[in-house]
Amino acid sequence: MKDYTYSVTEINEYIKDLIEGDPYLTNVSVYGEISGVRPRKGHIFFSLVEENARLECVIFGGDNMGIRLQEGRMALVEGSVSVYIPHGTYRFICSNVRYLDQAGMYQIKFETTLKKLLEEGLLSRPKKTVPRFPRKIGIITSRDSAALQDVIRTARERKAPIEIYVFHTSVQGDSAREELIKALRKANEYDLDLVMIVRGGGSKEDLWGFNEEDVIREILKLRHPVVTGIGHEIDRVIADFVADVSMHTPTGAAEYVIPDASEIHEDLDSFLEKLIASLSNRFDMEERRLETLYFRLRMIGRRKLELNEFKIERVKELAAKLRKKLMDCFEQDQEKLESLGRMLESLNPLRPLERGFVLVKKEGEIVKESSDLKRGDVVSLVFKDGTKKAQVIG
């Protein structure tokens, strides 16, 4: 370090050159709350404040231009940082002031957070694959929300053999941020096939919890694939950008994630057809190979056969091994067919009736809870061998 003594002016001038020569402090935009407006000698001095910080600002000639700043208003100011050498202070020289409403504030925060995540490469990370036939699905939403009912209704309509785990959280309001983080962390502890994050539509303020940086970073920590269905068609939150799959609505997300039972049957039928065709082709091919070997052996003269008896034995050994290999393959494929059969049988809704259970229907609909019935209701009792009518007496 040089052995040199600076004057106050030299230090301030050096700092001025550093700050005013920094492109990140020139022609930039800053937002905050207007405070301490002080017109003086044709200029307007004021502060931009937020919870734990303050930035001194000035509009040169602003008073003469008829500019009137309002205390307490949120504003976006444009300009550059400058150093005032006589006092050794810095301030923001404003070239333009624009008031912000609540929507404007949310939009600025949205863009700022999105840009930060983009610069960190978090929006371009590889996407996880969403399983086609999930069995365990976690849902992060309010237990009282219409979004949850949309997902449950879709699951019932599709008759899919799935387990649903609900991780309750507020989806709007002051507590949404902390509760969403807790729900995400809880879901990460479970052995799930995927996680759905859903809620219905609303204003930017209602949906803001899904734009909070802390919430987004917690979503990125999930071990499971993430599917979002937040808001309506026009709504877009930052959680959608980091999800592995993003749908426009809760119902859309549910339809994407939950397979239809008919699709499962179709896939099984297709697999069985391909398996049978593959086995048939394999047997045909091996049969032709054996016929070819047999024909070649017949063409060989007796004398040559006697001289090459060991070759014949070798062919027999190979044929035996081939036969054994075919039988092993057949047994393996038979096990697969039996497994598929058991899976199809487990999907049969009438299976429990063979064990003595009774299916209760009211007006053609299955009764799932006792609260769905009242005294005097006429119901149908479905046994394994027929149906009987009954009346609720208590």
Curated annotation (Swiss-Prot):
It is an enzyme of class 3 (hydrolase). It comes from the Bacteria. It comes from Thermotoga sp. (strain RQ2). Belongs to the XseA family. NCBIfam families: xseA. Keywords: Cytoplasm, Exonuclease, Hydrolase, Nuclease. CDD domains: ExoVII_LU_OBF. One of its GO terms (biological process) is DNA catabolic process. The keyword Nuclease applies. Its main location: cytoplasm. GO terms for cellular component: cytoplasm; exodeoxyribonuclease VII complex. Its EC number is 3.1.11.6. GO terms for molecular function: exodeoxyribonuclease VII activity; nucleic acid binding. It catalyses: Exonucleolytic cleavage in either 5'- to 3'- or 3'- to 5'-direction to yield nucleoside 5'-phosphates. Signal peptide: none annotated. Bidirectionally degrades single-stranded DNA into large acid-insoluble oligonucleotides, which are then degraded further into small acid-soluble oligonucleotides. This is Exodeoxyribonuclease 7 large subunit. The keyword Transmembrane does not apply. Heterooligomer composed of large and small subunits. It is found in: Cytoplasm.
